[in-house]
């Protein structure tokens, strides 16, 4: 006898087509079972099929989904989850046209977050991050990548990574930890970026030993770290056993996309300024293009990443929130789906694949997350929607009814039984 049986599922989005990254037409294809049923036993999916195929199955608990839609738990592969403070005080300055460099000189911008993160205790960072994870869960997300990067020194970077490790034990969402010590060049290292990168590299052996990070990331952009610096840094991280990511071509076509493909990065993220050559190289690689349209939207920029061109050329595209206090303060992956549809010209089918299958591969979780398949963890979302196109179409709200994490109900609309986080 099964533990749980979900019946009367109007559309069951299994996302279970070919293994590996989805490209071109595969991105525009959604495996959907009409009148579907999912069986769960010992926190694992044990049955996926139609109501006809499920005849005779029995379970301790039978949940009637009322003809609504069920999908896998969503995957957010790019967030800056652990940080101190917030930066709503900068909104008026931005609207007045005050340049970012001037905001920095006033102690704002990333420096404000760095200072707040340094001053916060680990427990304060954990509690604040729990609050944000709770929201992510309520939007249907069950797997999240979490970066450090608001320390720019060893002590605070360790604190962020240790906070992430604690969150992994205390919150139902699965976390994937990324070391982003090379997020910016601190003032005291101005003009000495190579020395700073060496300092960050010196932290990696102990980080690997303590298993505090799975990925290493770097911000490759004009005025921060060059393409050559980024490649050298990430290749050394790979030699130490880390997988790598790169913040690439967010503003300028610097060559970050090309570098990511060349060194075999798991993902290249942002890519607003990616060149035609960079897109071509990504299409011929296993590097996922993780696009962050919420950031472009919040920064009030006109030019978005060329998502349509990337997909048409064969790039494996994923979507993420880029949740952070400065350029994209939202946990709402559903809003990102809507923006991607409208501004990146992605179809609803492509959007769904980009927040499940491809996003799971962007963080090396393609074998465990992003699909409803027998043998996988029962990470499921019941939606207050009867078809998949409705979710990105009706934007700005959450359509989630219930979230199951490892077969257990982790969120139900109107209830917050998963955490007592405060902010």
Curated annotation (Swiss-Prot):
What Pfam family is a match for this entry? Amidohydro_1
Which positions in this protein are listed as binding Zn(2+)? 78, 80, 247, 322
Cofactor annotation = Zn(2+); Fe(3+)
User: What is its subcellular localisation?
Assistant: Cytoplasm
**Catalytic reaction annotation:** 4-imidazolone-5-propanoate + H2O = N-formimidoyl-L-glutamate
Q: Where does Fe(3+) bind?
A: 78, 80, 247, 322
User: Which pathway does the protein contribute to?
Assistant: Amino-acid degradation; L-histidine degradation into L-glutamate; N-formimidoyl-L-glutamate from L-histidine: step 3/3
- Gene Ontology annotations of biological process type: L-histidine catabolic process to glutamate and formamide; L-histidine catabolic process to glutamate and formate
What's the Enzyme Commission number for this chain?
Answer: 3.5.2.7
What are the UniProt keywords, alphabetically? Cytoplasm, Histidine metabolism, Hydrolase, Iron, Metal-binding, Zinc
Q: How is the cofactor bound?
A: Binds 1 zinc or iron ion per subunit.
The residues listed in the UniProt record as binding N-formimidoyl-L-glutamate, with positions renumbered to this chain, are 150, 324, 326
Q: Where 4-imidazolone-5-propanoate is bound, by residue?
A: 87, 150, 183, 250, 327
Gene Ontology cellular-component terms listed: cytoplasm
This entry's Gene Ontology molecular function terms read: imidazolonepropionase activity; iron ion binding; zinc ion binding
Tell me, what does this protein do in biology? Catalyzes the hydrolytic cleavage of the carbon-nitrogen bond in imidazolone-5-propanoate to yield N-formimidoyl-L-glutamate. It is the third step in the universal histidine degradation pathway.
Q: What is stated as this protein's family in its record?
A: Belongs to the metallo-dependent hydrolases superfamily. HutI family.
The cross-references to HAMAP family, in alphabetical order and at most eight, read: HutI
Q: What is this protein called?
A: Imidazolonepropionase
Source organism of this protein record: Bacillus cereus (strain G9842)
């Amino acid at each position: 006898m099964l533990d749980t049986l979900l019946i009367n599922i109007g559309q069951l989005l299994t996302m279970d087509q070919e293994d590996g990254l989805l490209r071109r037409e595969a991105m525009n294809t959604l495996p959907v079972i009409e009148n579907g049923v999912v069986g769960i036993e010992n926190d694992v999916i044990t049955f996926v099929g139609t109501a006809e195929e499920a005849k005779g199955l029995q379970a301790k608990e039978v949940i009637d989904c009322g003809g609504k839609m069920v999908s896998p738990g969503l995957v957010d592969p790019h967030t800056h989850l652990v940080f101190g403070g917030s930066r709503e005080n900068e909104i008026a300055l931005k609207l007045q046209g005050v340049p970012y460099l001037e905001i920095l000189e006033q102690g704002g911008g990333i420096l404000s977050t760095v200072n707040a993160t340094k001053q916060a205790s680990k427990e304060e960072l954990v509690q604040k991050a729990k609050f944000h994870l709770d929201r992510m869960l309520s939007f249907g997300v069950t797997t999240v990548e979490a970066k450090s990067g608001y320390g720019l020194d060893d002590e605070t970077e360790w604190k962020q990574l240790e906070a992430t490790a604690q969150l992994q034990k205390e919150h139902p969402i699965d976390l994937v930890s990324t070391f982003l010590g090379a997020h910016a060049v601190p003032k005291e290292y101005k003009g000495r970026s190579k020395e700073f990168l060496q300092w960050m590299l010196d932290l990696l052996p102990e980080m690997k030993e303590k298993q505090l990070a799975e990925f290493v990331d770097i911000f490759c952009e004009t005025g921060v770290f060059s393409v050559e610096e980024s490649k050298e840094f990430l290749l050394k991280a790979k030699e130490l056993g880390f997988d790598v990511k790169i913040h690439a071509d967010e503003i300028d076509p610097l060559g970050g996309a090309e570098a990511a493909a060349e060194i075999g990065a798991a993902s290249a993220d942002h890519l607003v300024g990616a060149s035609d050559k960079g897109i071509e190289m990504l299409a011929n690689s296993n590097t996922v293009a993780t696009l962050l349209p919420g950031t472009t939207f919040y920064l009030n920029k006109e030019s978005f990443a060329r998502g349509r061109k990337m997909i048409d050329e064969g790039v494996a595209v994923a979507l993420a929130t880029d949740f952070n206090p400065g350029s994209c303060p939202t946990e709402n992956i559903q809003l990102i789906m809507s923006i991607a549809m409208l501004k990146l010209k992605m179809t609803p089918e492509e959007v769904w694949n980009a927040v499940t299958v491809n996003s799971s591969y962007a963080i090396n979780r393609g074998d465990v997350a992003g699909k409803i398949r027998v043998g996988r963890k029962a990470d499921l979302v019941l939606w207050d929607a009867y078809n998949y196109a409705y979710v990105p179409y009706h934007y700005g709200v959450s359509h989630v009814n219930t979230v199951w994490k490892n077969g257990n109900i982790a969120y139900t609309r109107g209830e917050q039984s998963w955490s007592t986080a405060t902010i």
